């Protein structure tokens, strides 16, 4: 099946487009500011783990993995994920996240953590993080705080997630 979009790693030329997509996808600029703060944090940002979907050279979707830790063990935080409203429910988000998770797997990364919609993220293999003994360190609904190994069957470390400072938690 041919799609009108292509998915690829972010380049410096995408920064403005990523901000525009993120602002359009959320009710405030907070998530767009989060992306920029994470990009500026050398301890959180991982080159090659920020992916965009584009149509005719225009960024229409974005997904980001940054470094976090579970009781000191390296892990990844998936957030934020953004799609222009007119491209939502078309497969852009799924394609972008799938490619991004594949890139993490190819790099040999470990666990991936997400605080997100319980009806959406299980399609990628996410399950409640509590099944692995992973906690957020703040109150979140169990079904919305999820984890998965980037490589199926690999261990997920138990403990409390330490997010980069930009997350504010």
Segments (PLM) and residue ranges:
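Conserved active-site alpha-helix within GNAT-family acetyltransferase domains
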Residues: 106-110, 115-141
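Short amphipathic alpha-helix that is part of the acyltransferase structural core
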Residues: 1-37, 44-59, 145, 151-169
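Short, solvent-exposed loop/turn elements at beta->coil junctions and helix N-caps
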Residues: 36-41, 132-135
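Conserved beta-strand in the GNAT
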Residues: 52, 58-68, 74-82
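Accessory recognition modules or surfaces
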Residues: 89-90, 94, 140-151
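Conserved acetyl-CoA-binding loop-helix of GNAT-fold acetyltransferases
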Residues: 83, 89-102, 114
